[in-house]
Curated annotation (Swiss-Prot):
Example GO BP: beta-ketoadipate pathway
Enzyme Commission number(s): 5.5.1.5
Catalytic activity field: 3-carboxy-2,5-dihydro-5-oxofuran-2-acetate = 3-carboxy-cis,cis-muconate
Sequence similarity: Belongs to the cycloisomerase 2 family.
Subunit and partners: Homotetramer.
Gene source species: Neurospora crassa (strain ATCC 24698 / 74-OR23-1A / CBS 708.71 / DSM 1257 / FGSC 987)
Function: Catalyzes a syn cycloisomerization. Also possesses mle activity.
Keyword terms of this UniProt record: Isomerase
Keyword check for Phosphoprotein: no
Name of this protein: Carboxy-cis,cis-muconate cyclase
Pathway annotation: Aromatic compound metabolism; beta-ketoadipate pathway; 3-carboxy-cis,cis-muconate from 3-carboxy-2,5-dihydro-5-oxofuran-2-acetate: step 1/1
A Pfam family of this chain: Lactonase
Length: 366
């Protein structure tokens, strides 16, 4: 079928889910539905369940759950408060739901991370028979200054890896049959200025890739088969051009922040992105070729994105083909579709949606 649908959320209120239709023959994108959701629950990160019948959202002070009946029929079913620290849900704290990961194996629990202050706990939710977020079954502790921004399972869904941006480390947990998790251990990032934001894993389970937000690089880790802990290989790759001015001369603050990394459907390639902290600068997108064992063979390109990316610039490879990738930005509100062919990347379609906070990550429905 030439028609595909993607759903996208927003960084700021009012809450809405946008459904975009991409035609892979005519190479066009168009907005076909704006679904209103609770106004004070904009979704800054969303993901599907294993069957794409439910959307789970990180929605300010809530974790939200929607039944997806069709690309244009999305129904809000539940919203749950942030678990863990008693102050996380207070209106006067900046604690915010930031990321969630849906298990693909029974019991199909959902693993959620708050961010900023009072974010030292991961939240585990059970789901109903239809996939609705049902109950907060565990609030497992990281450490007081933790701020997890991304997680990934190994291919067997036995081990869970978390990128702790504020505590500057990677955590490993073991998943139990109940869906709850127990701590295995943690390792510090290679450099005090790295701040891991995102993790991706090779389909073999041999290698983990950690995206460093402040370090603006991808660091490669091999998984120790005995301990299941990640071990840094001392191979890293830039996500902004080497030598580019990366500090504001007046404030000393960083000008760029790496964002997201994700593998293509085949597992042969990985894309990663960075954002600029000033609108007059551009973000960057990088592509990598992976060996069959999972190690990074080489960096294929590092190219500027049309805008800074704002809070977003999130890359979203198509989950059933290496050919397509989506990228979103909330500086100007673009969703763009790129084609990956013969190890070259080119944009084929785009649509601008000038709504507040559009667009955060895009998820591929069909």
């Amino acid at each position: 079928m030439p028609l595909h649908h993607l759903m996208i959320g927003t960084w700021t209120p009012p809450g809405a889910i946008f459904t975009v239709q991409f035609d892979d023959e005519k190479l066009t994108c168009k907005l076909i539905k704006r679904t209103e959701i609770p106004q004070d629950e904009p979704i800054s990160w969303m993901t599907f369940d294993h069957e794409r019948k439910n959307i789970y959202g990180a929605a300010m002070k809530k974790w939200s759950s929607f039944a997806v009946k069709s690309p244009t029929e999305i129904v809000h079913e539940a919203s749950h408060p942030i678990g863990g620290h008693p102050r996380a849900n207070d209106a006067d704290t900046n604690t915010r739901a930031i990321f969630l990961l849906a298990a693909k194996q029974p019991p199909y629990a959902v693993y959620a991370n708050p961010f900023y202050k009072f974010a030292g706990y991961g939240n585990v939710f059970s789901v109903s028979e239809t996939g609705k977020l049902e109950k907060n079954v565990q609030n497992y502790e990281y450490q007081e200054n933790t701020g997890i921004h991304g997680m990934v399972f190994d291919p067997t869904e036995t081990y869970l890896y978390s990128a702790d941006l504020t505590a500057n480390k990677l955590w490993t947990h073991r998943k139990l049959a109940s869906g709850e998790v127990e701590l295995v251990g943690s390792v510090d990032a290679p450099d005090p200025g790295d701040h891991p934001r995102w993790v991706a894993m090779h389909p073999t389970g041999n290698y983990l890739y950690a995206l460093m937000e402040a370090g603006n690089r991808i660091c490669e880790y091999v998984i120790d088969p005995a301990t299941h802990m990640p071990v840094y290989t001392h191979h890293s790759f830039p996500l902004i051009p080497p030598g580019i001015p990366d500090r504001d001369p007046e404030t000393g603050k960083g000008l760029y922040r790496a964002d997201v990394c994700a593998l293509t459907f085949s597992g042969k390639y990985m894309f990663a992105s960075s954002r600029a902290n000033k609108f007059e600068l551009q973000g960057y997108i990088a592509g990598f070729k992976l060996r069959d064992c999972g190690s990074i063979e080489k960096q294929l390109f590092l190219s500027p994105t049309p805008t800074s990316g704002g809070h977003s610039n999130a890359v979203s490879p198509c989950p059933w083909s290496d050919e397509w990738m989506a990228i979103t930005d909330d500086q100007e509100g673009w969703l763009e579709i790129y084609r990956w062919k013969d190890e070259f990347l080119h944009r084929v379609a785009r649509v601008r949606i000038p709504e507040p906070g559009f667009g955060m990550n895009a998820i591929w429905y069909d």
